[in-house]
Amino acid sequence: MYNNAEGAVKIVGSLLSSQDERFEVVVSDDNSRDNVGELLSGIHDERFKYFKNEKNLGAHKNWEHSLELGKGEWLYLIMGRDIIDGGSVSNLIGQLIKARENNIVFLKDDSRKCKDFKISEGIDAMIDFIKYNHPTGCIFRSDLFGAIPNRTRYFEISDMYPELYVIRDMAMKGKCAIICSGVNRRFMGSDLVKVKSSVECGMDISKTYFSPSRRTRQFFEQLDMVESDLQGVFTLSELDRYFKERYVFFLENVSYWWRMWNKDPELMAHYGQPIRHVSIREMARNIIQGYKDTTVHLKEKGTYTPSRRRIMLCITSWAVVRLCTKSAIKSVLEPLGVWKFLHRIRHRGNIQA
């Protein structure tokens, strides 16, 4: 948590409103400059602990630090921009007890239609996680999190959400559960999310910037210009391979970072950078370059292998292969505008039939 006194007080207050005694609330303050310490110091509850870093660690390192501070059986990472329903905590704990044999639990937020409790493992679990990808909503087994070798490097090299690497590591070692708890939803009125929860007004996903069809359309409008900017970074065929491997994460990162650079000075300050106008084209180019730099970094450290790369990155390609037929693939990609793009590149001779 950083410079978000109002959000921290709301989250802590909501959680501690629960009468359940089987959990603790730990706040890791990344050396905030606001009055969050003063406000939280007035909370007297044995379930609550407040820590302030002596220096600013940055978002990723503070996430790791906050998870290390937790002493319970499960670790639940909560972001300062989310709303937590303290009245549902007991229900969540009961479901976690049932899910004890699992390595990770993914929580659907209350703006999504909830289905039955689901168990998956390995690559299936990783694919499921794509659908519910958000840091708030991932609950880790604390013993397994602590046992991840060289865990710190995940928080050093990640360009966005380091818990993705942690989750992939755990998913490949055991079962994962997806449950609907009604505990969390994304903060209403923030710069990153413009659509209120279905609990408040009903959700029309087409109105939000994160709508897949919207961000895909805007992204592909820029692709011709992106291609000319990629000289010396990626060839077009390499871009295609990268796109197929990281389709979901690529588009998500472009849209998230574009919104953050242009609209969110508070969050950018947490990353030590000023707000400035950035085009979607520039974001696409920067993210591709960042992916290339990360790959080089892993190779230099001796932690990069083709097999590990396939496990960590080729999630969507594997999912598409499972559809088996060209017509099935087309039926999925065509509404998103992706099929037209792949067809165009193929006829340029960059994709083999």
Short names for language-model regions:
Residues 269-353:
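Membrane-proximal basic amphipathic "stem/tether" segments
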